[in-house]
């Protein structure tokens, strides 16, 4: 009986030690919390400012992450073998990537921390870095990390790297090679890592949307049908305009970048009203905000009302930026994608 009690006591102590926060992680968390607290306090000053001058003043005092990046990196380097150092590497790689410490942390993802747990978000963020830098790191994590979230993130990010290579390819052979590699990685995410999420978003869902884009939204593909209603509830379809060149614009009143493009689109709609060219929008505001945007920017082309940036139409097109412009040929095939007004005008001879 006594030996059983001793055994149970040992197990309890072990559990308590295991549950105790890692000292390195706690030290890093304290630095991050201090920085984030100061940022929040400054943000509240901007929100509560009574005049534009006050807002400008407080915008000029937004705390820099530089000092905190230096502190976090020192803790990481002093405790490289501590599991809690992964938090510092993740934060530096995602929140301080523009500083030297952030660049060092990116390399750590593929070296000292390639087997660490808790770095999945930082690994996924490598999809946005140049492939020459990111690919060796992603492959190191994919091959050596024993944790499913990290392996899934590396596989997904590799898929996105090759997806972007495909989008940027200027010759058919390079495009097909990149497309094949992207599909291979995305299919692995869908089949092997179907349950993995990062920041609450299932990677398999993101991979599925991008595979759909590769298969159905590439230049030369026939654009999927769009069937919806405008803000007043009148229904119409993309196929109603077959026989005309169609410019698609995904936009919203909430989108500051759209504000400068909308007047140009209005001018283009006016200039082409007697030609076999039509501009159709996909608006991503809630109905009341959509009506306000139509008035504020005097929008003179018809738009489907999608309700949000994750509405049914927008989701199909797997958008990453706003505004997004497409040009479709009269037969419905995509001729330009993620393009700009100047390229559209040149293609149409305007």
What name fits each language-model region?
Residues 244-246, 251-254, 286, 321:
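Short pre-active-site segment immediately N-terminal to redox-active cysteine/selenocysteine motifs
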Residues 259-298, 305-315:
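Structural microenvironment flanking redox-active thiols in thiol-disulfide oxidoreductases
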Residues 75-85, 95-119, 125-132, 141-152, ...:
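Short solvent-exposed coil/turn linkers within tandem alpha-helical repeat scaffolds
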Residues 176-229, 239-242, 288, 292:
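N-proximal helix/coil linker or "cap" segments that precede and/or mark the start of modular domains
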Residues 295-300, 305-349:
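Thiol/disulfide oxidoreductase modules built on the thioredoxin-like
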Residues 242, 250-267:
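Conserved redox-active cysteine motifs that mediate thiol-disulfide chemistry
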């Amino acid at each position: 009986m006594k030996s059983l009690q001793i055994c149970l006591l040992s197990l309890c102590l072990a559990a308590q030690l295991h549950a105790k926060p890692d000292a390195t992680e706690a030290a890093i968390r304290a630095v991050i919390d201090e920085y984030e607290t100061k940022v929040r306090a400054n943000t509240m000053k901007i929100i509560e400012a009574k005049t534009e001058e006050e807002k400008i003043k407080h915008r000029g005092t937004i705390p820099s992450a530089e000092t905190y990046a230096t502190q976090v990196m020192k803790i990481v380097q002093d405790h490289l073998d501590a599991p809690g150092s992964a938090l510092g590497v993740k934060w530096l790689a995602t929140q301080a990537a523009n500083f030297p410490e952030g660049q060092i942390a990116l390399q750590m993802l593929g070296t000292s921390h390639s087997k660490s747990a808790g770095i999945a978000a930082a690994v996924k963020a490598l999809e946005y870095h140049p492939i020459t830098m990111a690919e060796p790191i992603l492959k190191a994590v994919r091959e050596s990390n024993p944790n499913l979230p990290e392996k899934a993130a590396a596989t997904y990010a590799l898929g996105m790297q090759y997806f972007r290579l495909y989008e940027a390819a200027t010759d058919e052979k390079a495009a097909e090679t990149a497309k094949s590699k992207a599909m291979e990685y995305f299919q692995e995410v869908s089949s092997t890592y179907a349950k993995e999420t990062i920041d609450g978003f299932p990677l398999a869902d993101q991979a599925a949307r991008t595979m759909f884009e590769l298969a159905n939204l590439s230049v030369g593909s026939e654009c999927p049908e769009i069937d919806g209603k405008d803000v007043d509830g009148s229904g119409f379809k993309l196929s109603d305009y077959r026989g005309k060149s169609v410019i698609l614009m995904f936009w919203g009143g909430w989108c500051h970048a759209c504000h400068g493009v909308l007047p140009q689109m209005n001018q283009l709609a006016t200039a082409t009203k007697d030609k076999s060219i039509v501009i159709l929008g996909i608006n991503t505001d809630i109905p009341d905000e959509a009506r306000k945007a139509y008035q504020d920017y005097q929008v003179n082309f018809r738009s489907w009302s999608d309700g949000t940036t994750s509405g049914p139409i927008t989701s199909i097109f797997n958008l990453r930026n706003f505004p997004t412009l497409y040009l479709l040929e009269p037969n419905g095939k995509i001729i330009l994608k993620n393009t700009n007004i100047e390229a559209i005008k040149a293609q149409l001879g305007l």
